[in-house]
Every structure is written in structure tokens, then in C-alpha cells.
Amino acid sequence: MTAILVVLVHLAFALAITPVLIGVMRTVRARLEGRSGGGIGQPWRDVLKLLAKEPLRAPGSTLVLSAAPVLLMASSLVLSALVPLVSTLALPSVPGVLFVVVSVLLLGTVALALLGLESGTAFGGMGSSRHMVIAALVEPTVLLSIYAISGPVGSSVLSVIVAARSVDAASLLNPVSLLAIVALVVVVIAETGRLPVDNPSTHLELTMVHEAMILESGGRDLGWLEFGSWLRLTALLGLVANLAVPFGVAADASLVGLLVGVATGAVKLLLAG
């Protein structure tokens, strides 16, 4: 029962902080470019507007066009539940073993790639091929990096790794650990389509990866795709932040511990973003 409560807290935290994180990132980028931007609340307004619209699908489209957005959103929610964002308490029936987390991450990646191929356009196929090339480089890097960090711990469960690193400050300065964290930062940039690997705000065909795959989607489908991609970014950033700075993560399900975990998790995510 306690573990289920922690999972619900993880999901609520991820759903609440994700639009804020995206809003802060967009606002900072806009200010650096000399623009005012749409404000921190703009992502919320964009998603709610898209979810209120009916999707337009081509008459010859298959089930992939409607299933891919749901699959991406579902995999992102599962990823948010498994990654120790707020607490290191694991759900016994759904272990956060590294292979499970990477498999869930890959599920969303494949859903996006199939969506790009489903459109039958040159842009969609190009985006899907680029996306899978990036995935082929990213997934093994995630496994090797976290296994390098987990060596002294003796476990591949992410919550156990974070908990062990929080009580062993010396392991944070280990050269292997530092190099693995740097590799994970590069992985997050590549997997979530951020600069310089991809530009999420572009429509230039030479630089499109994520945008090329969702170019034919609209309405509710596009809303799920956007929010699902944002959730993946939140989960991966939270994982890297808690592996690099594992302090403030709740070790129990007490109210004070969870509140501290939520507060420190929010600060880490906003700084990492």
C-alpha cells in the first residue's frame, strides 16, 4: 500500500511539474534570444487546447495513427512511475530494474517511429530513420552508464542505486561515476530531441527529427504526443538529477519526507532543465 502511494505521488508530481518545466525552459530560451516568450503557463494552455480538438486522420490510415499517441503517453506514465523522482521506495509488483525501464523507454521510441512511417510522407520516413539511429546509440549507452554506476551497489534497481548513493558521498566523485553521468546527460539531450541533436521548435526539414514524425498529427493526437514527449523528458532529467545529486530523495512514505522529496525534486528538475 505504501509503495502504491509513492507511485501515485510520482505520477502526480510528474504530471504537475512537466508543463512548468517546459514553460521555464522555453521562457529562458526566449529571453536569451531577446524575446518575451509566451510565459511559463503557455505549455498548459497549448496542451489543453489540443486535447479539446478532434483529430483529423486520413481515410486510409491504420490503427497506428490513433494508437501511437496513446502508447507514447502510457509508456511515459509508466516510466515516470518507475523512476525514483521523489522517493526511493519501489513498487514490489513492478520492479524498477534497469532493463524494464529501458524497455519502457524503447516502447515509446518505437511508437513514435511507427507513427512517422504511418504518414507515408518523405518527412515522416526521414524523421523515423533518424529517430531509430539515435535510439540505437542511446539505449546501449543508458544500460552501460547506469550499470557502471550500479557496480559498487550490486543492484540494477534504480531506487536502490539512488538510495545507496545518497548515503555514500564518496561514490559521487568516483571518475567512473562522473563519466557515466556525463554520458547520461548526452543521452537525455539526444533521446528527448533537444539542441544540438534536434530542435523541437523548427520546421526545417534538414534538422527535423521529432517534428518530422508528428507532422501529420493534430488535435487530441498531437496533444498526447506532445505531453508524452514532455513526460519522457521529465522522467529522464529526474533520473539523471537524482543519480548525480541523490540528496533530498524521500527514503520513506512519511508526509514530511514526501514533501521534502517533491520540493527538492522540483528544484533539481528546474535547474537541470
Regions found by a protein language model. Give the residues of each.
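Alpha-helical transmembrane segments of multi-pass membrane proteins predominantly involved
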Residues: 1-273
